[in-house]
Amino acid sequence: MSFAEKITGLLARPNQQDPVGPEQPWYLKYGSRLLGIVAAFFAILFGLWNVISILTLNVGCLVAGIIQMVAGFVVMLLEAPCCFVCIEKVNDIADKVDSKPMYFRAGLYCAMAVPPIFMCFGLASLFGSGLIFATGVIYGMMALGKKASAEDMRAAAQQSYAGNATPQTTNDRAGIVNNAQPFSFTGAVGTDSNV
């Protein structure tokens, strides 16, 4: 068993089916899950640090810390439901979110990560929520899908040039607008008070 198979076996859920959509590379699929778990852990940890800021009577950081901790718990619930075995419906919720398109999860993670950063800007909220935001960005990239092959892109480029009937110009002044007037420096405006 190779190292990659061991890692994918550790990060796979029990009874997990392959996604119906386009196949993602294994390192992106399981890397996003691993980043989500690490992001959730640090979001909870640094959210707790922001909650302790109530000692300095900073209510904005208290609320931001609570939101960041809730976001961390939600990400942990969706990425690693095995951490919440004491709650009955966790697997149902995780399966329901897994059945949604990837851009749903990307938008959810990015939307949950932004408010704590704006409410209490600091290293704790920036790092904790920033990792959740990075997880959302990776899920967004996975939602966009793979890039087309080089042959497909060449064929599409040739078709777009074939439809363009205008001749290509190589003149140095080809980008200049016709009948454009040069700038003129006429001096001071008539309403200038010379101050």
From Swiss-Prot:
Residues carrying the site annotation Calcium ion selectivity: E79
Topology term for the membrane: Multi-pass membrane protein
SMART domains: Cg6151-P
Pfam families: Cg6151-P (PF10233)
GO cellular component: cell projection; endosome; presynaptic membrane; synaptic vesicle membrane
GO molecular function: calcium channel activity
Transmembrane residue ranges: 34-54, 66-88, 117-137
Regulation: Channel activity is inhibited by La(3+), which reduces Ca(2+) influx and thus inhibits it's function in promoting activity-dependent bulk endocytosis (ADBE) in response to high stimuli.
Key words, A-Z: Calcium, Calcium channel, Calcium transport, Cell membrane, Cell projection, Cytoplasmic vesicle, Endocytosis, Endosome, Ion channel, Ion transport, Membrane, Synapse, Transmembrane, Transmembrane helix, Transport
Cell location: Cell membrane; Cytoplasmic vesicle, Secretory vesicle, Synaptic vesicle membrane; Presynaptic cell membrane; Endosome
One BP term from GO: synaptic vesicle endocytosis
Function (record text): Transmembrane protein which mediates synaptic endocytosis, fitness-based cell culling, neuronal culling, morphogen gradient scaling, and calcium transport. Regulates synaptic endocytosis and hence couples exo- with endocytosis. Controls two major modes of synaptic vesicle (SV) endocytosis in the synaptic boutons of neuromuscular junctions (NMJs); Ca(2+) channel-independent Clathrin-mediated endocytosis (CME) in response to mild stimulation, and Ca(2+) channel-dependent activity-dependent bulk endocytosis (ADBE) in response to strong stimulation.
Description of how the protein assembles with itself and partners: Homomultimer. Associates with the dally/ magu complex.
Family to which the UniProt record says this protein belongs: Belongs to the calcium channel flower family.
Protein name in the entry: Calcium channel flower
Organism: Drosophila ananassae
